[in-house]
Amino acid sequence: MRKTKIICTIGPACRNEETLTDMIRAGMNVARLNFSHGTHTEHLETIDMLKRVREKLNVPLAIMLDTKGPEYRIRSFENGSVFLNDGDDFTFTTDQIVGNEHKVSVSYPGLADELSVGDTILLNNALLNFEVVSIDGHDINCRVVSGGELSNNKSMSFPGKTLKQKYVSEQDRSDILFGIENDVDFIACSFVSCKQDLLDIKAVMGDSVNRIDLIAKIENRTGIDNIDDICTECDGIMIARGDMGVEIPFVELPIIQKALITKCRLLGKRVITATEMLESMIHNPRPTRAETSDVANAVYDGTSAIMLSGETAAGKYPVEAVDTMARIAMQTEKNINYTKRFGTTEFRIKNPVDAISHATCGMAIDLNAKVIAVCSLSGMTVRMVSRFRSPVDIMGMTVDKKTWRKLSMSWGVTPVLCETYESTDVLFYAAKNKAIATFGLESGDRIIVTGGMTNGVSGNTNLIKVETVG
């Protein structure tokens, strides 16, 4: 079975039950809703549709809400756009005006107070580059370093700067509460720069923080520099290479990607590699060779999940994109020696759950087991076993439907919903039967079972047992 999970962004190209069904069958594990676009009414229709489809197929499809996050944008031009030449003078202002070829308003009222002479302003995915030459009251006077066409409402970025805009906007607050009300499984938090950003999100979530997992989107230098602190407050990260590639030199992206994947894997945090993975499939039925290698390299690095954005949201071939990504991942995984990696990687073993999870994976390799069955209420033990990237298939057993869905994003895990067990004997019997039914085991095949003896108590992992079919 494929170990690397696939996240798909839902948009006009796939927002119908037939296409969503085909995408799930092709390999979609998590459906992502981008709240930078659309209304709550539109998103509710999509969520209800996803719930109907997953119920019909009886699959643990998880739903991810991706927040808009703190954004900095220019406002509108009188004629919709202007063309700026290299060397032109141009002004950004916090005054509310209609833009022209000399000046345009910005959305953040405190911008002039926070920028300095010599700072860089990038627009339109860094295609347009401005240098601040002076600041006069509300006006930020710039020189155009790299010109081009600039149109309404383009986003702005400021490499090397951390601005003081409030992290959780009213829009994000409303979206988060909407997601809680409609039972989303993950919230992806945009432009996370420090752990306080996540604490602010958790304050909005209240008690729901224990039911919805937080994914920190790493999109700027500050987020990269603060990754250790950020990982203490999140359940995983997304390497959002689009905005990250604007903020930092593009030649550093592959190095940062590999470092972040390795860090999260060792910490037991899920890690998503995202942006432009199969970008050409927005228009073409097949990927480029470079895109194929990009997906494969993320899989080689051990990413938990790979993500499709415009390919499924707005592309001509959403189902084909999912199928292509799944086939690349599976073929790559066949050529990775996970047993050797397990033996040579130095893991941090900090507590009994870590130790038992590590021992479980080692025992499964030594005994040539076919399946590791992990029984977990919250999914924590399953995620800890997953982080060791075992060559043996992992079956994540849980009585909780929410956990069942969230395990869909854990590397190497096949989520299985089970009934409550009353004793270890019942647990072992259920694990064996579920493994036989799920993986087609035969007489003589071994299963390693791990979990906790106390029914219904999270974080009580304290046993390992070897079961043999037959």
Regions picked out by a protein language model, each given a short descriptive name:
Residues 1-470:
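Non-catalytic helical/linker scaffolds that mediate oligomerization, partner binding
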